[in-house]
Amino acid sequence: YGCGGVQAAVENPELGLINNWLLHIRDIWFKHSSLLGEMPQERRLDTLCELNVMEQVYNLGHSTITQSAWKRGQKVTIHGWAYGIHDGLLRDLDVTATNRETLEQRYRHGISNLKLKHANHK
């Protein structure tokens, strides 16, 4: 995807206050290190971008604002898309959530798809 933020989170250079913004991506790196560690370097950053999107969909879906809206029956939909800087394409990562149940299902499905995608590229 060509995301400089994800690359900086992995390389961890001294960037001052920007490093605080990148901590969450580093947490995702460590959380999914077994999957990412098995991958060739050229696929790691793109996969970390996708994991970051999935984690952010999950976090947003668990926010009190979103949870309250869903409890009230409001039609709130969270989409997980990744934009490729290198090709200008927007990719749907298939983690769209419309309620708490679909949030959990789509998150697990998205992670499983990434593992399967990696297994098929070995």
Named regions from a protein language model:
Residues 2-122:
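Divalent-metal-activated hydrolytic enzyme cores
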